[in-house]
Amino acid sequence: MAHITRFEAPWFLNLSKKEYKWTIRANPGPHKLSESIPLALLLKHYLNVAETTREAKRLVVEGKIMVDGRVRKDYKFPVGLMDVISIPSSDLYFRIVPDNIKYLMPVKISKEDAKYKFVRIVNKTTNKNGNIQLNLEDGRNILIPKEKVPEMNYPTLTTLKIEIPSQNIIKSYELSEGKYAIIIGGRNVGLHGVIKTIQYAKYKKRKYSIVTIEQKNGESVQTNLQNVMVIGDSEIDPNVGVR
């Protein structure tokens, strides 16, 4: 289906429900329909670089828009958590970050910041040769050669800071107490601070373990382990762009 009614679209999309009946439906891709923004809608309604959907489509088709360092010519391409949007011709760069009101929002970043993406390891698999494949949240995979496994055997839910589009790993942030994290789901989405405690459940740890995060204002919030993404050691990584 090429389109979707505005009432059926994800609740967080920045759309006027009374303007038109139909809107763009995101194509299958690295992010779920319920957790993404179609590229053309992002350009028109969030970044304001196009006044009409037709203008947004033209920008995409002409190859002026890059997502995670690669030109995307599909105006329905799904853009989601921590994706980097680059418009080199206008010297504009953005990162999609969690927001407490709008769920996902673009924040302006520098050209230097746009070289990096932050992704969580959702699971790992070991092949018959002893190599480890890291399966990341945005659908990409990184293969760790057998000889490098001892030094690069990252735990699941670790956040990797990678170069894009090369996928070279620059830094890793393991999910543990004392690390700086942002909440990426649930009612406290978008709030961030230092992880004070992690209460691990005996079963279904990601769903039922409780993480307490202390914000910069001193207030604490709690969420499930699966909703937490580490974005720094004791402070935010300077290239993230979260304020």
From Swiss-Prot:
Domain of life: Archaea
Pfam families: Ribosomal_S4e, RS4NT, S4
Annotated InterPro entries: Rib_uL2_dom2 (IPR014722), Ribosomal_eS4 (IPR000876), Ribosomal_eS4_central_region (IPR013845), Ribosomal_eS4_central_sf (IPR038237), Ribosomal_eS4_KOW (IPR041982), Ribosomal_eS4_N (IPR013843), S4_RNA-bd (IPR002942), S4_RNA-bd_sf (IPR036986)
A GO molecular function held by the record: structural constituent of ribosome
UniProt KW Plastid keyword: no
Database matches in PROSITE patterns: S4 (PS50889)
Gene3D superfamilies to which the protein is assigned, alphabetical: 2.30.30.30, 2.40.50.740, RNA-binding S4 domain
Name of the featured protein: Small ribosomal subunit protein eS4
